[in-house]
Design a protein with these regions (language model features):
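Glycine-rich portal/gate segments that line the openings of hydrophobic small-molecule binding cavities
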Residues: 27-30, 38, 57, 61, ...
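N-terminal signal peptide c-region/cleavage motif recognized by signal peptidases
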Residues: 7-9
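Short, surface-exposed charged micro-motifs
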Residues: 23, 66-67, 97, 119-123
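Bacterial N-terminal signal peptides that target proteins for export
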Residues: 1-4
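Extracytoplasmic/secreted envelope proteins and their assembly/folding machinery
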Residues: 43, 47-53, 121, 155, ...
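Hydrophobic ligand-binding cavity/cleft-lining segments
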Residues: 11-72
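Beta-strand/loop substructures that line and gate deep hydrophobic ligand-binding cavities in soluble
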Residues: 110-156, 160
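One face of beta-strands
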Residues: 18, 31-35, 92-94, 118-120, ...
Length: 177
């Protein structure tokens, strides 16, 4: 029983250790999202993780992710996402273009997909013995989804998605740069 308690406490501590923060503000039909988390990775390791676009298939709902290099600092990523939100089955396809800023982050914009628009950035900031990942987006979902469904997804899935992203990144602590 003591081992079970210790394990549960270790899991709770590990989750808090990422210092995950997520904030979503709706302005009209657009959603502005800001999120951040901390990982014990160097800037170089963090940048390599950030630009491993196809690792997203380990996040719940991301069924496929295919990356095509446009040039040395630009990547086009096509993703297929399937979710069940409340009782609604949702299938979305998007094509994103990422502009890479070595060891600083990425800028991205949806060039085709289900949202009216989706754009944002990841930024990396060295802090102590690790890196803070900062995410910000502006998006306007297509109106084919009921507003309540969109709000449910944003409020209930974003935290768990960022927690998964942080856990996957933390597993790369021993990978060379």
């Amino acid at each position: 029983c003591a081992w079970l308690m210790a394990f549960a406490c270790a899991l709770a501590w590990a989750s808090d250790d990422y210092k995950i923060k997520v904030e979503v503000v709706q302005k009209g039909n657009a959603f502005h999202t800001q999120a951040s988390f901390y990982l014990p990775l160097t800037l170089c390791q963090s940048y390599r993780y950030l630009t491993d676009y196809d690792a997203a298939t380990n996040i719940a709902g991301v069924v496929a992710s295919t990356t095509t290099r446009i040039d040395a600092r630009t990547a086009r990523v096509e993703r297929l996402i399937q979710e069940r939100i409340l009782f609604f089955p949702i299938k979305m396809r998007m094509v994103m273009e990422f502009t890479e800023l070595p060891n600083l982050g990425t800028d991205f914009v949806q060039i085709s997909g289900e949202a009216k628009y989706y754009k944002g950035a990841w930024r990396l900031e060295s802090e102590g013995n690790g890196t803070v990942f900062k995410y910000r987006t502006e998006s306007e979902p297509d109106s084919f989804l009921p507003k309540a469904v969109i709000e449910y997804f944003i409020k209930n899935r974003l935290n768990s998605s960022f927690e998964t992203i942080a856990k996957m990144g933390a597993e790369r602590v021993k990978q060379p740069c």
